[in-house]
Structure formats: structure tokens, C-alpha cells
């Protein structure tokens, strides 16, 4: 469970992957690609959720880890593009961690690939419904997006924001 507590995440990292964050993330992306290839759905959400607890590792070794991570992530984006799937920009963690899933650092590449996006707060608390939305739209605009994909009358449409 990539959304589990750090303790559970760290335990799985050590027990299942011998402490190798790279192996854990490789497996996560392998399964993600398999899901995108074999399932029929419109939206992929939480694409980089694996980094939620991994950020504590990235913070110390960012320069060493990021090149291989970004390469793997780009391979997943290529599959998303080929399959024509919408990517969710999820703001649920914005208040707590000042980040989204997918992370803002990926938006330019997603735009360059022509991957459509939708924005969602994934909110479980009505008081936090709008948390991070304006920041997400701002980041999208900064990275070249002018539209988001919205479901209207049972059909997906690109809507300017």
C-alpha cells in the first residue's frame, strides 16, 4: 500500500526490496504500466504516489536518485500518452506537504507529450475541498496548459481555465 504510514512503507521497503528504494519504485511503475496497458479506464490518479513516503529518502539523495526516477516516470508517461489516458492532478496533500500527485515538476513533460489532465481535490473533509486547487491551476498554466478535461453530459471535454 503506497499510501500507508511511513512505518509500513519502510517495513515493506526493507522486507520486500532489501532496502532498495530503486527496486521498490521500479516494481511500482512496472505494475502501473501493466494496469494502464491492460485495463480500460479514462483517468489515472496518484501516478507518483509512491514518492509520498519516499520523499524522506529523496531529500537526502535527490541528486543521485532523481535521474533514474525521472527516466522511469517518463517511460510511464509514454504509456499514458499512447493509451490516451487522462492524468489526474490531485491536491489532497497540498495543505500538509505543499505538493500534488502528480508532482508539479512533471507538468511540463506531460504538456510536451500532449497528455490531458484533470484537477481533483480528493477531499475527505468538506472544509478542505478547495485546498491547493488555485496553486494547481497556476502550475498547470505556468507549464503551458490552458485546458483541463471535464466530464459533461457523459462525454469528456477540454475546458479552458
Predicted feature residues:
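Extended substrate/RNA-proximal surfaces in nucleic-acid metabolism proteins
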Residues: 1-83
